UniProtKB/Swiss-Prot annotation:
Family of the protein in this entry: Belongs to the elongation factor P family.
Record's GO cellular component terms: cytoplasm
Key words of the record: Cytoplasm, Elongation factor, Protein biosynthesis
Organism in which the protein naturally occurs: Streptococcus pyogenes serotype M49 (strain NZ131)
Function, as annotated: Involved in peptide bond synthesis. Stimulates efficient translation and peptide-bond synthesis on native or reconstituted 70S ribosomes in vitro. Probably functions indirectly by altering the affinity of the ribosome for aminoacyl-tRNA, thus increasing their reactivity as acceptors for peptidyl transferase.
SMART domains for the chain: EFP, Elong-fact-P_C
Record's protein name: Elongation factor P
UniProt-listed HAMAP family: EF_P
Length: 185
């Protein structure tokens, strides 16, 4: 059992028969009354997100999540296909469940598949990935305003803000946790 006050982003727990992943968690102390935990949660099975509050002392059953190394094979229609790199078993995951993760991976990329018992519940991507700029505005000579930048569409469809000197065709390192530009590759 785990108390609501100990729940952090990324943790998974069971409540009311649902498997729930914490997206955001924060303590909130109103001017009057007891402390509450405000949380943004995702139902792992349906993909729906919702906001809720809990008392800090409420207890939940922490879900045991196992991960296995896998390779992203391809996407067809509404299904993404992955292969366990140890056993060569293949897994089909609805695109709706891994839509955000697919923005960071290319075919044949290494990932980790998450299991709850024998049920596939998600994919973990590396903390940084290397992607190529598919489209961006041309650089303007003399544009030296610091902190500006421009949007760039990467080969997976992800749009990130990049410095003005970045051009189409360049490879970039992207932080997958925040979806931000780190450096040129």
């Amino acid at each position: 059992m785990i108390e609501a006050s100990k729940l952090k982003a990324g943790m998974t727990f069971e409540a009311e028969g649902k498997l729930i992943r914490v997206l955001e968690a924060s303590h909130h102390k109103p001017g009057k009354g007891n402390t509450i935990m405000r949380m943004k949660l995702r139902d792992v099975r349906t993909g729906s997100t919702f906001d809720t509050t809990y008392r800090p002392d409420e207890k939940f059953e922490q879900a045991i999540i196992e991960t296995v190394p896998a390779q992203y094979l391809y996407k067809m229609d509404d299904t993404a296909y992955f292969m366990n790199t140890d056993t060569y078993d293949q897994y089909e995951i609805p695109v709706a469940n891994v839509e955000q993760e697919l923005l960071y991976i290319l075919e044949n990329s290494n990932v980790k598949i998450q299991f709850y018992g024998s049920e596939v519940i998600g994919v973990t991507v590396p903390t940084t990935v290397e992607l190529t700029v598919a489209e961006t505005q041309p650089s303007i000579k003399g544009a030296t305003v610091t902190g500006s930048g421009k949007p760039a569409t990467l080969e997976t469809g992800l749009v990130v803000n990049v410095p003005d000197f970045i051009e189409a065709g360049q490879k970039l390192i992207i932080n997958t946790a925040e979806g931000t530009y780190v450096s040129r590759a």
